[in-house]
């Protein structure tokens, strides 16, 4: 349901995929990209008199993540969706959702170097420092920096972070991506400017961290912090980001 922020009235009930998991605004603010757990991506035009779907695509059988390109000069040029099954991500035309490049995520685990045949794509965000998507692969524990500046000659930087990556969000500078490795009770900090792992935060992290995007605010004592809640306990942990 799309609700008018002023009148609080329902403007339209838009047909989407099953159990919408993620909603992402386009850089322009005109379009809303949503993905259901059934891997259906909907492109909704919010500037129409009655906002509704203008494009729909199924990228697989099960999915969790979608986003659009945000780097200067590439704003909304591309969209990306990551799927649980098949284990892959799909780069699409940002205006039409036409699939342009499909890449499998099968590979080796970061710790034991064992081959994993079906590692699921968890959270995806778009870098503000480079023309790259940050793609987190759950079972292998790899964070992929996918360079979309030339998708016909795709370049991917693979950062070994931690296994069982799930959701996460930017710190306040949008340089550092804070992603939960939930079954390892760890927060991995990835530098999206230098493309490297900065730190694995374990001290103080509770059981099964599940931040969503997390929350950034300035603590009066500790300064800038990023906060996460947990599925396995009732704690909220603050991580300093200055």
Task: Name the predicted role of every residue range.
Residues 1-242:
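Predominantly soluble domains enriched in secretory-pathway, periplasmic, or organellar proteins
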